[in-house]
Amino acid sequence: MTLNGWTQITLYGAVVLALVKPLGWYMTRVFTGERTLLSPVLAPIERGLYRAAGIDARQEQTWLGYAGALLLFHVFGFLVLYAILRLQAALPLNPADQAAVAPDLAFNTSASFITNTNWQNYGGESTLSYLSQMLGLTHQNFLSAATGIAVAVALIRGFARASTRTLGSFWVDLTRAILYVLLPICILYTLFLVWQGIPQTLGAYIDATTLEGGKQTIALGPVASQVAIKMLGTNGGGFFNANAAHPFENPTALSNFVQMVSIFAIGAALTNVFGRMVGDERQGWAILAAMGALFLAGVAVAYWAEANGSPVLASFGLSGGNLEGKEVRFDIAASALFAVVTTAASCGAVNAMHDSFTALGGMIPLVNMQLGEVIIGGVGAGLYGMLIFVVVAIFVAGLMVGRTPEYLGKKIETKEVKMAMLGILCLPLMMLGFTALATVLPTGLAGPANAGPHGFSEILYAYTSAAANNGSAFAGLSGNTPFYNATLAVGMLVGRFFVIIPALAIAGALAAKKTVPASAGTFPTDGALFVGLLVGVILIIGGLTFFPALALGPVVEHLAGAAGQTFAMGD
């Protein structure tokens, strides 16, 4: 570990914190319907879109109506994306003559991109046409990110409103998230990325002759526009197979830093939106503090583990940190920080190969996802996931003091707790259930490239990433098989919608309740005690649930490495 590394981490945290209030203020105005700087230009476009779609922007929906509209929208989006991928060979903007995507891979990819996961069992430059990348994937990157923001805003309204059955309009929230938040930032962001050296072209791939006389095909495409939304929207799917490790996706240290900031920007700012909309900004800062505590702990462990390197190599007197799988233009600190950021925020983009991290260094991204992607989390998804944990934490606090649990003047009762636990428990069910299945079936065991505990970790990481809607991978797993394409897709769909629906049900139940005035016995939820309780609940539920699986994978791998033991295929 170096002073330069810690300086990078400190600067990163400072920049993200500096964006929380201004971006939170702006998004609050957007979703409360107030005038913004962009309203003179965008408001007429917004009204025109509503007229064209036959939507009454003033008509709000109950939680069931909101959820129904959301699900219908995603079914349609899934079918359209699946059709684009299957018909790719017959569609235009295909200069490399890419063939149609296989049915099982198209199913997996469609599920992946509508759920904001962006798990990729293919190499983008060798599988997809420009049309599929733009109209199919980039389009869904905007829609899935906007959906997460919309659900978070609906849940905030559930806490903020009283004695009402409505949560707003899904169509309005979706439109405003794209039109006022995602698109304006992405336009400027794309220009910055082009300036940094990322291609943005519809020209064909280039056939080049190397200095040694060999032939090489240089893949190009509309890369910058996809990178902008994949980072800002915490989607994570790469235009190229190497993702953000590819110099055409992430060419410089500056582009790397800005991409990391953009991953956290909206998710962190939504905590401020929460505080503003419920009338007490301290509530938002308390939630952000809990997120920050978990994030800093993860960064410290991951950086320490990668800086110290493999214990097996250290036993031979080799030091200098673990540089395997890392780009030389990014040092160990930037690679470890990116890994923690991308898995804390359910982004899944990578600038280094997580499969090449040390056992403990690779365990941190795994744990980040297993905690429910609530450490900032995906845009919107992180906040509504954290608020689900808040409901459980408040319920636990009420049990400890023998009082009816209350949060922001709303009583937390049986329905809210049941829905919260449904949203929490569906993730380990997918992560651990499918991992167990893959480890006992020959088709599952054929996937990992490594034996022993690391091979188990590759399987566990895949299903954890899918259910947590992250999309990153221990890439030693060969996942492009019917078994993995199908099971990973199911994990992604359940991990997305079986959290969204309980979150909306909680919002509907809370919005219908009257606000109870605070009393002397009300548990304060804006201080260090609440932050500690919330972090404790997250660690207990997440940590204890997954500890046996972690013990079989990265923990055993680390202990075996410290004892000088390695595993070959077949061991």
Curated annotation (Swiss-Prot):
InterPro entries: KdpA (IPR004623). It comes from Methylobacterium nodulans (strain LMG 21967 / CNCM I-2342 / ORS 2060). Signal peptide: none annotated. Pfam families: KdpA. Part of the high-affinity ATP-driven potassium transport (or Kdp) system, which catalyzes the hydrolysis of ATP coupled with the electrogenic transport of potassium into the cytoplasm. This subunit binds the periplasmic potassium ions and delivers the ions to the membrane domain of KdpB through an intramembrane tunnel. It comes from the Bacteria. It is a multi-pass membrane protein. NCBIfam families: kdpA. One of its GO terms (molecular function) is P-type potassium transmembrane transporter activity. Coiled coil: none annotated. Keywords: Cell inner membrane, Cell membrane, Ion transport, Membrane, Potassium, Potassium transport, Transmembrane, Transmembrane helix, Transport. Belongs to the KdpA family. GO terms for cellular component: plasma membrane. This is Potassium-transporting ATPase potassium-binding subunit. The chain crosses the membrane at residues 5-25, 64-84, 136-156, 178-198, 254-274, 285-305, 330-350, 357-379, 421-441, 488-508, 527-547.
